[in-house]
Amino acid sequence: MRRLLALVLSLAGLVFTANGYRPVSKQGYLAGYAFGSGVFASELPTQAIVTQLAALAVVSPRLSARVRAITWLVSVLSWLGLLGLRRTGRAADQPLTAALDAGLGPDRRAESGDLWKRPAPGGATAKKPGAARMLRIYRDYAHDADISYGECGSRNHLDIWRRPDLDRGGRAPVLLQIPGGAWMTGNKRGQAHPLMSHLAELGWVCVAINYRLSPRSTWPDQIVDVKRAIAWTKEHIAEYGGDPDWIAITGGSAGGHLSALAALTPNDPRFQPGFADADTRVQAAIPFYGVYDFTRSDSSMHPMMVPMLQKHVFKVKRREHPDEFRVASPITHVRQDAPPFFVLHGTNDSLIPVEQARSFVARLRETSDQPVVYAELPCAQHAFDIFGSARAAHAAVAVEQFLAEVYASRPASTSVGLTKLAPS
């Protein structure tokens, strides 16, 4: 029994690693395993090696020489695979750079130092990227927390991320972060920390929001709250050192969907009940691994997605109310005057197939007059940016470079003073 258990554990480790290269399934409940194990294998491969090694060290002394040799051989194959995933993650700057060059041109800006980066001597709080950093990063930057932007209690709260030495009288560019969670879970804390901490350290003001969730709330409550948060930010962010005239929006998964939809429906009264006159325009959008078309039934839509949406989010059948799903799809609202977009998606996404991003980007490029950048990241799973992995750090730098190019191209009327950081 002990021998069998050891062999099963070593083979399970090999399957875990292989799933990081090619998900075992993108349909049904197995997709959940493919996502859960895949994101750990691809984003935390070193930790996975240590875990597998520790487990093998515990059981190995009790095995016969033959079984021990087999389990070690299988485990070594798994570790070599994990080292390959580590190498792919650390090289994620290559597809990101290629995407930026293709979308913005090879003469694009490579950094943003002369635009808004004004670090005061000794005032920086940035630390080296890493998973451990993410455990403490919130307290370094989220100095204004649980601010109300609406009337729905904690679901209408937001946090403001900034450097503690940021001049509140300045006009820092602003990033609005929309959390994901299948429109039913998710919180302003715990997502996009690598990106927000990177930009906050450079002198940005970042706003992370909560919004109403299903099944307690029903679509379009989620996008209404996002729009209300944009309106609040435009009205109040100057009090915290932000520029109300320059706001970019981002989010992952459901947040990717909501950020894209918000960017493509500025001032749309259907999504602004009671505040139709509020300005909800944004200057750029950076959706991560989002859903962009709810009307499809092919391989671009996870087979469990539509039943979940019908039962818990929209609470109507798609075949009976197709317009509700069509209007909720960002691809429906692609327009010539869309803001610049930077779309990021992993090739191995088991929850939202990469085909969603491909078709959305194709429509944007056909229609929009503004730059459209698309980065497809090899071996990246859903939620690849949650941990402080090398891939997440590269993605944060790429987003900075994209925003630097867009910010530098802003109309002269909006360039009212560059961000300055106060002396520490």
Feature-to-residue mapping (PLM):
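Alpha/beta-hydrolase superfamily serine-hydrolase fold, recognizing
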Residues: 1-424
